[in-house]
Amino acid sequence: TAPIWFVFYLLKDVSEAQISLIVTIQYLSQMIWELPSGALADILGRKNIVIIAFILSIIAYLFMPFVSGFIPFLILSILSSIGDSFRSGSEEALIYDSYLQDDNEKGIDKLYLWSNNIYQLGLILGAVLGGYLYTINNALPFYLYTLSLVIGLIANFFYIEPKIDSVKFSVENYLLQIRDGIKEIFKSQQSRLISFFYIFVGGIAWTSTLYFNEVMMVELGFDDVQRGVYSGIMRLI
């Protein structure tokens, strides 16, 4: 949905200002829900949290073609952000501890390398196909993305929860990690300069990739297929 979500929101009676607000709240929500997601994973199990994450994301993307207006899209975007928060850490921990339990730590790096390549390839193909499919039916990219989430949900039922838990969540440990991270940033002039440089560059790069590129291409008059192709090329580069 990367090359078409902006025009889709506009089509659904969401203004540009409201889209900006939705995106801001969505990422704030994702950040806020990172904290309780770790505690819930320890209470309910990482596998169950990932299942809940997939269900929330499926609901969000399945209903997007059927709603219109600011409030419905805001609610669905928040659901999607909670799903992303629940899935991000728990899924990685589930895989990491599974390899750790099998005494195969070296296999983790190979898996991450392979999965990242597949992920990037999927983003490229998804961007190119998304623009084309949108011209056929503007809901089609959302249906197909929902289908991919359903496949992920089904695959997750075959996960085996590892008996070990390498990282036990606690608020104290979470706050200690934040404190140590801040100390690391400000420990020397060099680390401060490097940290602020990456924050500055990352802020520009990520907002451009996730938001401004799409807006600018629409304003410049690129059609749906062209935006999909250019989004795929930018991801490849």
Q: Where are each of the predicted segments found?
A:
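Helix-loop junctions on the cytosolic side of multi-pass membrane transporters
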Residues: 138-172
